[in-house]
Amino acid sequence: MKKVLLALSLVSVFGAVNAAEVAPVVEKQTCEKAVYPKSALMNEETGTVLLSVLVGPDGSVVDSKVDQSSGSKTLDKAAVKIYSSCKFKPAMKDGKPQQAWAKLEHIWSLS
C-alpha cells in the first residue's frame, strides 16, 4: 500500500512588504484536514498547486484562484477547498488589518 504524503507550504504576499506591512499568515490548525481525493488516489495523480487567496481584514478567505494547476482538476479543487476553510492572521499596514492577496503552494504526493 502506498503511503500518502501531503505537504502544505506557506505564504507570501504579492509585491514587496516593507517594515510597516505584514503579510497574511495562515493559521494551519483552523484548516480543513487535507484528504487525498479518492479518484486522484486511484489514478495515482500527484502535483503541485499554486494558489492565490484573498484574505479579508477579519482573516477570512474572500476569494481564491488557481494560479498554476497540478495537472489534475480534482487535486486543484481539493486544494482550493482546504485553504478556503482556513482562517488567517490578516495582512497589517500601519497596525491596521488589511485585505491582501496571499500566494500558497500545496503539494500532493504519493510515496
State where each predicted segment sits.
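Sec/Tat signal peptide C-region and signal peptidase I cleavage site
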Residues: 15-19
